[in-house]
Amino acid sequence: MARSFYSHIKEAWRSPKEGKLAELQWQRKQEWRDEGAIERIERPTRLDKARELGYKAKQGVVVARVSVRKGGSRKQRHKAGRRSKRQGVNRLSRRKSIQRISEERASRKYRNLRVLNSYWVGEDGSQKWHEVILVDPNHPAIENDGDLGWIASDDHKGRAFRGLTSAGTKGRGQRTRGTGTEKTRPSVTGNDRQGK
């Protein structure tokens, strides 16, 4: 049985540091480093992944590549007094993933669009790149789309900031149910951050 075009792309991206994709990625990163932190692009780098996550090549759908520094949080030393436990500066990580930060930054730049989903496209020693799929909720092509029309509802305003995207639900511990996840519902903060 003949394999689809998308299956070949998917197989190549399983090991991006090997084969032809490795050289292609090396060239891409040279260009990406010279670009801005948030760049709108014409078409997705990983077409198979983008299509899986809801991307369609139609009006009202936009893709942006976002770069975010790697590592933990960048905290400044407190000027006022604190007990030792609250004085920490180093070895502290954010309570959200870099992918979520990418989605939020893209959402802030394109305020009239809503984040549908995002996926990883590369990283080097100092930064990670994600491509964020954004949708225009007021575009007629989106409002009348059977697959994407739901995002036009007011319930989905500020999806990225409320942790309603795929990366957001994962970071909030909503992927699993049952034993061990009692403290993640209704939310992590609703249980005094005991669930995470």
UniProtKB/Swiss-Prot annotation:
Residues 186-196 have a biased composition (Polar residues). Coiled coil: none annotated. It comes from the Archaea. GO terms for molecular function: RNA binding; structural constituent of ribosome. One of its GO terms (cellular component) is cytosolic large ribosomal subunit. Gene3D superfamilies: Ribosomal protein l15e. GO terms for biological process: cytoplasmic translation. Keywords: Ribonucleoprotein, Ribosomal protein. The keyword Ribosomal protein applies. InterPro entries: Rbsml_eL15_core_dom_sf (IPR024794), Ribosomal_eL15 (IPR000439), Ribosomal_eL15_arc (IPR020926), Ribosomal_eL15_CS (IPR020925), Ribosomal_uL23/eL15/eS24_sf (IPR012678). Residues 69-100, 161-196 are annotated as: Disordered. SUPFAM superfamilies: Ribosomal proteins S24e, L23 and L15e. Residues 69-98 have a biased composition (Basic residues). Belongs to the eukaryotic ribosomal protein eL15 family. NCBIfam families: PRK04243.1. This is Large ribosomal subunit protein eL15. It comes from Halorubrum lacusprofundi (strain ATCC 49239 / DSM 5036 / JCM 8891 / ACAM 34). The gene is rpl15e.
